[in-house]
Structure formats: structure tokens, C-alpha cells
Amino acid sequence: MTSRSRQAAYSGIFINETTGEFPQKEQELFEGIVAVIAVVILTWMVFWMRKVSRNVKVQLEQAVDSALQRGNHHGWALVMMVFFAVAREGLESVFFLLAAFQQDVGIWPPLGAMLGLATAVVFGFLLYWGGIRLNLGAFFKWTSLFILFVAAGLAAGAIRAFHEAGLWNHFQEIAFDMSAVLSTHSLFGTLMEGIFGYQEAPSVSEVAVWFIYLIPALVAFALPPRAGATASRSA
């Protein structure tokens, strides 16, 4: 584990432990703010991936070849670029996991985090040593859609946290009750709650925020890239 990875992990532990020291309302407010930050970061990441997914493989290969051909200093610059890129993703993961942990204090979110880390290690090994080929465009597309649904759940969770903190008390009627169909006490319901923020009996405001975020995000994601951006990439 790199020093930046350790720093990100320690930061996540510190933040998670600190929330337990807050009074209940302040803790809910903190959780809501963390969820909003996570939504912003994840949304930015999705549209960044959408922007670079078309030519990212070719651009990366060209940049690596150019850096390695210029000498040792450029090689170290490449190493540091990868280092800070991984550190940045680690910090994003801290906020993402913290927001997920705040929604469910059971064993499933930590277990999911460990399984995700193990899966990343296996895929990294296969990519580096196994020589498997990955269609980055398709990979970014489907993972981006997945992340948008995760972010929508976090947005709904944020409005729920703000209500519990006493900041938002509008439209708190129960929109529907799915407990008879998919209870959060079931295995699949717990999994959906931990990943997508599923609630068996959400309030009207939670459902509204979920749709208000997700529909424009999906429409913006489905729109073709701007002509200027496409031309600049092809140039």
C-alpha cells in the first residue's frame, strides 16, 4: 500500500470515527453533507469518463511511449502521474464508502468494500499479467450508468439526513411501501440499500430528489458529445 493510499485510508477512518462524537442532529447534518460531496464527485467522474472514453486507450499508449522515449526523468514523471491518479481515486473512494457506510451500519458495506478491493486486485493482475483486453469505451459507459444510479441513491439519502437533522421537513409523507415486495431486512434488499440507497418506504421528498437528479443526469449522459469537443479530440 502506498503512502497516499494509507493517507486516504486513515482519513476515511478518522472521518468515520469523528462522526460518532457529534450529537445526533449534527451527525445527520455531517452525513448529509458528505453524501452531497460524494454525489458531486461521482457525477464529475462520470462525465469526465464520458469525455475521455473514446480515445483514452490511444492517448494513454501514445503518452507512455513518448514519455519513455524521452529519458529517465520523463519516466519518473509518468510514475508520479500514475501515483497521484491512483491517490485521487482512493480519496474519491473514501467519500463514496463513507457515504455508503452512513446509510447502513451493518456488515454488508464493509464486506462489499473488501470484495470490491479484492476484485480490483484480481482484475489488475489479469490486465497486467494475463494480457486480457478491455474495451475501455464500453467499460466506462456501463460503469458510468451504474455510478449515476448510486449517486441518485446518495442524493436521496442526503435529503433524508437533512430531514433527520431538522433542516428539511417538507414532503415527508410516505410515497409507497415496498416492504412486502423487497424488505431491507432481506439479503437482496440489504444489498440494494448498501449500493443504491434503496428504502422500502421512502418519503415523497426522497423519491422526488432521486428522480430530479437521475433523469437530467441520464439525459445529459445520453446526449452526443458537443461538436467542438469531438473535433478537438479528432484533431
Curated annotation (Swiss-Prot):
Q: Where in the cell is it found?
A: Cell inner membrane
What InterPro entries does the database record attribute to this sequence?
FTR1/Fip1/EfeU
Pfam families to which the protein is assigned, alphabetical: FTR1
One GO molecular-function annotation for this sequence?
ferrous iron transmembrane transporter activity
Q: Which residues cross the membrane?
A: 29-49, 78-98, 107-127, 139-159, 178-198, 204-224
This protein's membrane topology, according to the annotation, is: Multi-pass membrane protein
This protein's UniProt keywords: Cell inner membrane, Cell membrane, Ion transport, Iron, Iron transport, Membrane, Transmembrane, Transmembrane helix, Transport
Q: What is its main location?
A: membrane
Q: Which residues lie on this side of the membrane: Periplasmic?
A: 1-28, 99-106, 160-177, 225-235
In the UniProt record, the signal sequence range is none
The UniProt entry's GO CC annotations, sorted and at most eight, read:
high-affinity iron permease complex
The chain's Cytoplasmic topological domains, given as residue ranges, are 50-77, 128-138, 199-203
- Give the function comment from the record: Uptake of Fe(2+) ions across the membrane.
Q: How does it assemble?
A: Part of a ferrous iron transporter composed of EfeU, EfeO and EfeB.
Q: Which family does it belong to?
A: Belongs to the oxidase-dependent Fe transporter (OFeT) (TC 9.A.10.1) family.
* Protein name as it appears in the record: Ferrous iron permease EfeU
- Specify the species: Shigella flexneri serotype 5b (strain 8401)
What lineage, starting at the top, does this entry show?
Answer: Bacteria, Pseudomonadati, Pseudomonadota, Gammaproteobacteria, Enterobacterales
Q: Which gene encodes it?
A: efeU
